[in-house]
Amino acid sequence: MACCQTSFCGFPSCSTSGTCGSSCCQPSCCETSSCQPRCCETSCCQPSCCQTSFCGFPSFSTGGTCDSSCCQPSCCETSCCQPSCYQTSSCGTGCGIGGGIGYGQEGSSGAVSTRIRWCRPDCRVEGTCLPPCCVVSCTPPSCCQLHHAEASCCRPSYCGQSCCRPVCCCYCSEPTC
């Protein structure tokens, strides 16, 4: 069975068997609303996942319970998603020193720029190698990037690694922050 055509499974890629390329999924991984047991290696996909498949945004689960926006056990515990988008550790590297948490804290320390972590849904973060639930940057992402990559434009097929369509965050209306 062929890989998914334009979807994104795992971060940055997923291949455990079958015919998979750098930006496609394990066979059948994208065909239902549940992850396959080995879709993205053990750190990414669990045998089943929540229908909306968000990890760390706005909530998550490591105990097996799911609500509308959480993941299955261990999905948020390793490299896929950090334990929480609002924790200061394990969120990749950025520019400068220091850190800010939340939806857009800015700061600086003299001439040294401050690293900011911007939380967003767990869609693909283009141009980075960071876990999708965090963006570390010296400049704030747009409100569109932060708040409008939602289930309506993500394929909810991957536990902790929901897949954005390529134009997911490109055509939404920019809200006023």
From Swiss-Prot:
GO terms for cellular component: cytosol; keratin filament. InterPro entries: KAP. Keywords: Keratin, Repeat. Pfam families: Keratin_B2 (PF01500). The keyword S-adenosyl-L-methionine does not apply. Expressed in the middle/upper portions of the hair cortex, in the region termed the keratogenous zone. Belongs to the KRTAP type 1 family. In the hair cortex, hair keratin intermediate filaments are embedded in an interfilamentous matrix, consisting of hair keratin-associated proteins (KRTAP), which are essential for the formation of a rigid and resistant hair shaft through their extensive disulfide bond cross-linking with abundant cysteine residues of hair keratins. The matrix proteins include the high-sulfur and high-glycine-tyrosine keratins. Interacts with hair keratins. This is Keratin-associated protein 1-1. The gene is KRTAP1-1.
